[in-house]
């Protein structure tokens, strides 16, 4: 996985941080946070917090006391130890797109299927730059709703040997994911000692944690599995239009969820989540890759470090309907501040289209290229006698060229990043090769990767036990 040792880009002054601190404290004490779960309300009552109906009015010092119990950094194991990940510090881990109900393949936009889910999972396995296939890479609408989480989890566990994300639609789905993890890794003790999944728990912003998300949180936290407590903020819709107000709300929501996770299981690993963008004030549509979202992302990194927490943000986000120039520049507008801020867990790193409604096969490849280039750009320079190349100057002298110099010949294969997607051909050669644009080249690449895909090995007995579990649970769920 990638370690980003570049300096973090911090934009908030000490005075600004103090103002934000006052803001979130006032929100949790005067407005409060709704928890649509009696179990959660009872935990807060027992901890001495003021509860009125479903609203908890939190003591900020109590919140910080709970947050301090969460680890600053932690490990997550994959079934292939080479793909274990570290969350926190300089580490950055990247996962594929999450949640779209539709897919785009070429000119066709359609409902996602289980076959699409499997193919995206296979693509995620085939690129080393991705540390995880994610979770719901796309929503397989051709499978029964009550049991499709079983098929998705089985695919993630068998078609990749990387870290996977847990299903969070309900507590039942979470229990199934945990049970399958126990099969894959050898029991409850094994997954509690070193967690095996990461699960996304979204806040129903503004200031409400709903029952389904909380049911899943209770299951995963009790099992010691990391959860990403994520305020879902589109400024102008789920938060006020100003970035400072959105940041204050984000802190209040994230820390209140993290506090609950620590009440469920003290020391449970958590990630400070952030999904922060804005709407088009003329149409009301969500917009992505905006300057405001990038600035909010930079602020979020600084805020999370202030609280001693790893954080999730960023991704190759775009509002574009197709893998065009807009899709590329908006994705970069989000991914560049992701690196500048040093986000530790990055969802939606490959495949996001149309505001998250669509998983795009060609866009997946474009995003992988962007991600590979950024990792190369954020790798520190090695400056030593060899890299200063004084001998090359002695060899070439004045007015010559370095193409044939020994220093060049020793390094020409690896001295520069070699793009898999970009074209640097002259116009005539590009036309002779069909005049194919980036989307067309991306199509060839993903098709080739799928043809060359090799499924990672898995013990036959473990595979059989997983498959038997899926069959049994599907029958119990009535599907």
Task: List where the protein language model places each region.
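N-terminal leader/transition segments
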Residues: 1-104, 445
């Amino acid at each position: 996985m990638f370690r980003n040792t570049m300096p973090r880009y911090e934009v908030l002054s000490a005075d600004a941080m103090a103002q934000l601190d006052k803001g979130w404290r006032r929100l949790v004490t005067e407005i409060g946070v709704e928890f649509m779960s009696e179990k959660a309300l009872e935990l807060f009552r027992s901890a001495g917090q003021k509860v009125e109906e479903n609203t908890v009015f939190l003591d900020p010092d109590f919140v910080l006391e709970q947050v301090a119990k969460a680890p600053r950094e932690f490990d997550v194991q994959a079934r292939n130890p080479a793909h274990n990940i570290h969350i926190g510090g300089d580490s950055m881990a990247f996962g594929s797109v999450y949640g779209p109900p539709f897919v785009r393949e070429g000119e066709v936009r359609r409902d996602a299927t289980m076959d699409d889910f499997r193919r995206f999972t296979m693509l995620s396995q085939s690129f080393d730059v991705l540390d995880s296939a994610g979770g719901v890479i796309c929503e397989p609408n051709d499978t029964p709703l009550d049991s499709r989480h079983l098929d998705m989890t089985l695919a993630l566990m068998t078609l990749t040997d990387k870290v996977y994300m847990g299903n969070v639609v309900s507590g039942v789905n979470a229990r199934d994911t945990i049970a399958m993890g126990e099969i894959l890794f050898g029991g409850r003790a094994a997954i509690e000692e070193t967690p095996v999944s990461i699960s996304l728990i979204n806040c129903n912003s503004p200031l409400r944690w709903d029952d389904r998300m909380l049911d899943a949180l209770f299951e995963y936290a009790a099992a010691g599995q990391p959860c990403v407590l994520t305020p879902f903020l589109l400024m102008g819709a789920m938060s006020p239009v100003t970035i400072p107000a959105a940041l204050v709300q984000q802190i209040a929501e994230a820390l209140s969820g993290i506090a609950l996770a620590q009440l469920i299981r003290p020391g449970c690993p958590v990630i400070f989540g952030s999904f922060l963008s804005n709407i088009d004030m003329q149409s009301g549509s969500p917009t992505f890759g905006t300057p405001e979202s990038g600035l909010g992302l930079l602020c979020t990194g600084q805020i999370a470090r202030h609280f001693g927490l790893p954080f999730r943000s960023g991704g190759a986000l775009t509002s574009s309907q197709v893998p065009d120039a807009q899709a590329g520049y908006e994705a970069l507008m989000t991914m560049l501040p992701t690196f500048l801020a040093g986000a530790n867990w990055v969802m939606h790193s490959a495949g996001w289209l149309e505001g998250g409604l669509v998983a795009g096969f060609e866009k997946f490849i474009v995003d992988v290229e962007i991600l590979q280039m950024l990792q190369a750009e954020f790798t520190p320079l090695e400056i030593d006698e060899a890299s200063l190349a004084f001998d090359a100057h002695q060899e070439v002298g004045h007015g010559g060229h370095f193409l044939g110099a020994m220093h060049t010949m020793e390094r020409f294969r690896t001295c520069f990043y070699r793009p898999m997607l970009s074209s640097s051909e002259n116009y005539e050669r590009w036309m002779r090769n069909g005049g194919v644009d980036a989307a067309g080249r991306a199509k060839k690449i993903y098709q080739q990767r799928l043809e060359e895909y090799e499924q990672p090995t898995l013990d036959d007995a473990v595979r059989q036990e997983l498959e038997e579990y899926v069959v049994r649970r599907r029958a119990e769920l009535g599907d």
